Amino acid sequence: MRNMVSEISDLSLAKEKSEAQFIARNPKSNDFHCKACDSLPGGNTRTVLHGAPFPIFIEAGYGSKLRDVDGHEYTDFLNELTAGIYGHSNPVIKKALMQGFDEIGISLGGTTTCELNYAEALKSRFLSIEKIRFCNSGTEANITAIIAARKFTGKRAVIAMHGGYHGGPLSFAHGISPYNMDSQDFILCEYNNSTQFKELVNSSQDIAAVIVEAMQGAGGAIPADKEFMQTIQLECEKNDIVFILDEVMTSRLSPGGLQQIYCLKPDLTTLGKYLGGGLPFGAFGGRADIMSCFDPRLPGSLSHSGTFNNDTLTLTAGYVGLTELYTPEAVKRLNALGDGLRKDIESYCHNTKMSITGLGSIMNIHFTESGRVNSYNDTAGEVIELKDLLWMDLLKEGFWIARRGMITLSLVLTESELEAFKLTIKAWIHRRMSLIRI
């Protein structure tokens, strides 16, 4: 067996070579990045898209394809980190937006039937939602759901999960950040640890809510154990704690969201991403008694305003996308394709540091010394250089994924594109076997 020093040296050389090729292939992206640094801190306004030596600048998207400013075309296997489920410039969405401009208009400053129609459509899909409100992002939905839980219970503390992500000010990848919103009010639990969760619930009488993903998205597409989620639901019910299920990413995994698969009935559900039809969107909803905290007819109710909460274009695009494109049949088909893709890639990973996690149309590639990822803790020792190498090598082959290894599918990907991606991954494993073999 080759020693670890040699392996690290070989990996460093391979990455340096790929990075040099990356720089040579993308001079215009480099130039745009340098120019952007004059106006934007680090040339960036969305941290997740930053990466050394510089990010690729995308010029256009069409169907399942992206084109960058240097003229390279990619098949998109990231799809806006789950938000781009309809592909790029979907004709049905485009038609709905143009009709919205022509027949409804924008910036109306009043209540419209758009919000009523979409609220009813979402309620019919996500059965735990009795009442719903709209906002502008999944982050805002999660923040406002926590505010509702505090108002409803009169309590303050919130249990979140290590590795969880509920928006920039609610990020728990490295514990509780002192820069998180109300960081002193959060209690952290290990994901999939039912025993610890019960202990935390019993340790305080001031817990207003639990916020959790049934599959950690930004944390690496790590699914929850069903027993863990059932424990959360039961303990919340027993202790008058509001159970907030973050389905901003995962609502796409079945017709009724991941809560349908896990047989859950959360008190509040948060939504976002693709449900805006490609435009900024967030929503939160659930039990009518909790949501009545926002009923402006009631004394002492919470104020929840936002100029674009009922934006006509977003609600029109979201409604058309959900009712005409991402129908229950389409949901099942897309997630079956995702399960098949993940299982095929998994079969290529035997005896390597590479593994793949996820459910349905959302998945994530990992590189660990053991070749196994069963919890967020297992990602602590990820070989980031291998993720970087895979990402740069896939760019050369014309495929776009997240640098962190995330893959999400869209409705417009064809079976031939899926097959080409699988074969490229298989060939990459063979080519880089000396670097990834256990």
From Swiss-Prot:
GO terms for cellular component: mitochondrion. One of its GO terms (molecular function) is pyridoxal phosphate binding. InterPro entries: Aminotrans_3 (IPR005814), PyrdxlP-dep_Trfase (IPR015424), PyrdxlP-dep_Trfase_major (IPR015421), PyrdxlP-dep_Trfase_small (IPR015422). Disulfide bonds: none annotated. SUPFAM superfamilies: PLP-dependent transferases (SSF53383). Its cofactor is pyridoxal 5'-phosphate. Belongs to the class-III pyridoxal-phosphate-dependent aminotransferase family. Its main location: mitochondrion. Keywords: Aminotransferase, Mitochondrion, Pyridoxal phosphate, Transferase. GO terms for biological process: porphyrin-containing compound biosynthetic process. The keyword Transferase applies. It comes from Schizosaccharomyces pombe (strain 972 / ATCC 24843) (Fission yeast). It is found in: Mitochondrion. Its EC number is 2.6.-.-. Coiled coil: none annotated. The modification N6-(pyridoxal phosphate)lysine is found at residue 273. This is Uncharacterized aminotransferase C417.11c.
